[in-house]
Curated annotation (Swiss-Prot):
It comes from Bacillus subtilis (strain 168). Belongs to the thioredoxin family. The keyword Phosphoprotein does not apply. Participates in various redox reactions through the reversible oxidation of its active center dithiol to a disulfide and catalyzes dithiol-disulfide exchange reactions. One of its GO terms (cellular component) is cytosol. Transmembrane segments: none annotated. This is Thioredoxin-like protein YdbP. Keywords: Disulfide bond, Electron transport, Redox-active center, Transport. PROSITE patterns: THIOREDOXIN_2 (PS51352). Disulfide bonds join 29-32. It comes from the Bacteria. InterPro entries: Thioredoxin, Thioredoxin-like_sf, Thioredoxin_domain.
Length: 106
């Protein structure tokens, strides 16, 4: 998973005509650490997509713009638009994440 470190990088990446997945996280977040323990297998399953992570504390304006209230959250973007958002309350298990991706990735 590649790291997004600037607003410019983020804005360029989301313009892709294929779906990209962005994980919003924070270093202090226990649920983010828990997700990191299982996300590797999901990355392998959905390896046709580009995956990125973005530290909400480093780029808070992006988290606010895309209504990321809790972390971890997974957002899917295509052609500059957010097409899906898995809120932190529903991102606690591999099954929840896989179900979300199977519903929203074409």
């Amino acid at each position: 998973m590649k790291k997004i470190t600037t607003n410019e990088q983020f804005n360029e990446l989301i313009q892709s005509d294929k779906e990209i997945i962005v994980k919003f996280y924070a270093d202090w977040c226990p649920d983010c650490t828990r997700m990191n323990m299982f996300i590797g297998d999901i990355l392998e399953e959905y390896n046709q997509n580009d995956w990125y992570e973005l530290n909400k504390d480093e780029l808070p304006d992006l988290a606010e713009k895309y209504q990321v209230m809790g972390i971890p959250s997974l957002l899917i973007f295509k052609n500059g638009e957010k097409t899906a958002h898995l809120h932190s309350a529903n991102a606690k298990t591999p099954e929840e994440v896989t179900e979300f991706l199977s519903e929203h990735i074409s």
